[in-house]
């Protein structure tokens, strides 16, 4: 059996690890582990792909390790495929140790029997989902009085995933909750009842909030009609309809995961007003709970050349917040790719 565990200094580590959950809550960034064994199975799934490796101990007993990656859709855009790892292959794998299970890790790189080194963030080939149109021809500037957001958008390749609100790489385990100050007494009680390890909605394939949707590493497709603006986030297959023909929200709307949205144009900006949310969290880590009184306003502002747009937002919650919160997400650019079904597989946590 070959298993090595030691500390390391981390510099600029794995931005993509934050695409779906806060890395530090599940894995130890200061503990690197290396295992050697045989590939048992490669699960090319979302939100996290997994490779299962059988490691034979000194006593001859086989122990199966599970090491996870970012999601299959993101991997496919850097050349990964379902058969990148095949059962029976000899593998030496290096990753970062899980905090709660001794035989789990987060994949960093692997060395195969022929000496090939495979890195999660190193491209293995072309984008499986790339369109034939070039980025130059797909960039469309605003037309007439209505800014043209139609197309596929996402973060620039290599940017990793943001957490919204200028939060960078995401909070660390045991770190301060930078937004706790906004919570009312009721909000504080909701925070005390929230466990980010097991209650994170995305673990259960449910989108937590608009800030997370805009901050993932997966693309978003927008279509525009006269009275409907549709935002299709590849992550978790979320589709949001923004009704442009309404001046106010209808009465008696049932609460829903992503609320009810109306919108209007202000020059090169689309303003999205959303109410009737189900209770959730604005940020999963360490947690910022929201009630069904949450009211958000997003502003999507298209650049002059039509190739990028900025995202800013405000959030009010008369039940859980004492003041309004505001923030922004990383700008998105037009992408030369197509959306794919996400088909989220719920995660097991302990």
Where are these regions (language model features)?
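PEST-like low-complexity, intrinsically disordered acidic/proline/serine-rich tracts
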Residues: 24-350
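Short, compositionally biased strand/turn segments
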Residues: 11, 19, 238-240
């Amino acid at each position: 059996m070959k298993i090595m565990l030691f500390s390391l200094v981390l510099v600029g580590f794995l931005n993509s690890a934050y695409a779906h959950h806060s890395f530090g809550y599940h894995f130890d960034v200061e503990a690197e582990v290396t295992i050697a064994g045989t590939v048992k199975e490669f699960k090319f799934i979302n939100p996290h792909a997994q490779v299962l490796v059988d490691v034979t101990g000194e006593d001859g007993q086989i122990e199966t390790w599970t090491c996870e990656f970012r999601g299959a859709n993101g991997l496919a855009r850097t050349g990964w495929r379902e058969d990148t790892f095949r059962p029976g292959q000899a593998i030496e794998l290096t990753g970062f140790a899980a905090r709660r299970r001794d035989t789990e890790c987060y994949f960093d790189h692997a060395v195969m029997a022929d000496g090939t080194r495979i890195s999660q963030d190193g491209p293995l080939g072309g984008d499986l989902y790339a369109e034939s149109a070039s980025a130059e021809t797909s960039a469309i500037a605003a037309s007439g009085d209505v800014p043209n957001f139609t197309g596929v958008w996402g973060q620039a390749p290599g940017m990793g995933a943001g957490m919204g609100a200028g939060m960078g790489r995401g909070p660390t385990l045991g770190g301060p909750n930078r937004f706790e100050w906004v919570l009312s007494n009721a909000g504080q009680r909701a925070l005390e009842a929230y466990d980010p390890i097991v209650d994170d909605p995305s673990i259960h394939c449910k989108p937590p909030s608009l800030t997370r949707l805009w901050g993932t590493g997966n693309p978003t497709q927008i279509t525009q009609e006269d009275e409907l603006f549709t935002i299709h986030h590849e992550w978790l297959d979320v589709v949001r309809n923004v009704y442009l023909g309404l001046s106010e929200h209808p009465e008696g709307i049932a609460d829903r995961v992503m609320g009810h949205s109306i919108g209007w144009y202000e020059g090169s900006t689309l303003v999205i007003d959303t109410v009737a949310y189900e209770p959730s969290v604005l940020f999963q880590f360490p947690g910022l709970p929201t009630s069904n009184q949450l009211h958000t306003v997003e502003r999507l502002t298209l650049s002059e050349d039509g190739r990028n747009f900025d995202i800013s937002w405000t959030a009010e919650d008369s039940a859980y917040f004492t003041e309004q919160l505001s923030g922004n997400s990383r700008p998105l650019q037009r992408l030369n790719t197509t959306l794919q079904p996400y088909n989220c597989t719920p995660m097991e946590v302990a």
